[in-house]
A protein has these predicted regions:
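N-terminal secretory signal peptides that target proteins for export/translocation
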Residues: 1-11
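Extracytoplasmic copper-binding redox domains, predominantly the cupredoxin/blue-copper superfamily
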Residues: 30-228
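Intrinsically disordered, low-complexity peptide-like regions
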Residues: 5, 14-16, 211
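A generic signature of intrinsically disordered, low-complexity regions enriched in glycine/proline
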Residues: 11-12, 112
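Compositionally biased non-globular segments, especially hydrophobic aliphatic-rich helices
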Residues: 8, 28-31
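Bacterial N-terminal signal peptides
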Residues: 15-25
């Protein structure tokens, strides 16, 4: 009877040990399936690098059609109350990235009228004249790049980029780019920068593979921006 009890105890210990090892292996594999993708923006063209001002740059990743990501990409999360504020005859922030389908507020915090509009393909709209202290709202239904202006103050400009992916990065002031928690797999890398001609509408893109040994985008070269 004692021998049976000892054997039974050993059997349970072995099974528990196997379960623990399997859970550890699954967890390790899960953590190994994502990485942080990094890159750096550099200006090309006639200007010398020492005098070039880095243009606003955004990159994003979309899975290549037919290439499943593991784990699957989560839906992009909307920032709380995304807004493009009009203040001191400028838009704040100058570049705003939102999930497609987001509603963006355009509050006027200047002591005079503004007339915000966009004529490019991302989202066409004209909010008309509206006074200080009031707000207009625009819904960006589909992915796209919208160039925003004011019909009264030509020096005002901004960009709203609506995306269908949570994997994006806005370049820092020194040109650094970083996207965390990128699942291993094949992606299209999309690159938008202020130095690109708006009329071209489409950002640059190329296919990349993200893996444990391939997570650096290297140097992303973009043209200098015209914005002062």
């Amino acid at each position: 009877m004692k021998i049976w009890a000892i054997n039974e105890r050993r059997r349970w210990c072995v099974q528990i040990g196997i379960c623990v090892l399997l859970l550890w292996a699954c967890s390790a594999e899960g953590f190994a399936q994502v990485t942080t993708v990094r890159g750096h923006v550099a200006v090309v063209g006639s200007m010398k690098a020492s005098h070039a001002v880095l243009p606003g740059t955004v990159i994003w990743l979309t899975p290549v059609q037919g290439a499943a990501s593991d784990p699957p990409l989560a839906a992009p999360s909307a920032p709380s109350n995304p807004r493009l504020v009009q203040k001191n005859k400028s838009f704040e922030p100058h570049i705003l990235v939102v999930p497609a389908g987001s509603s963006v507020e355009f509050p006027n915090r200047d002591p005079f009228f503004h007339n915000v509009f966009s004529l490019f393909e991302g989202k066409r709209f004209d909010l008309g004249l509206y006074e200080a202290g009031t707000t207009r709202i625009v819904r960006f239904e589909r992915p796209g790049i919208s160039y925003i202006f004011c019909n009264i103050h030509p020096e005002m400009s901004a960009v709203v980029i609506a995306l269908a992916t949570p994997l994006y990065a806005i370049a820092t002031a020194d040109g650094q780019l970083s996207i965390a928690n990128v699942p291993f797999g094949r992606y299209m890398l999309h690159i938008w920068s202020e130095g690109m001609v708006p009329e071209s509408k489409e950002p640059e893109q190329r296919e990349i593979t993200i893996s444990e040994n391939s997570s650096s985008l290297g140097v992303i070269r973009v043209p200098a921006a015209n914005r002062q």
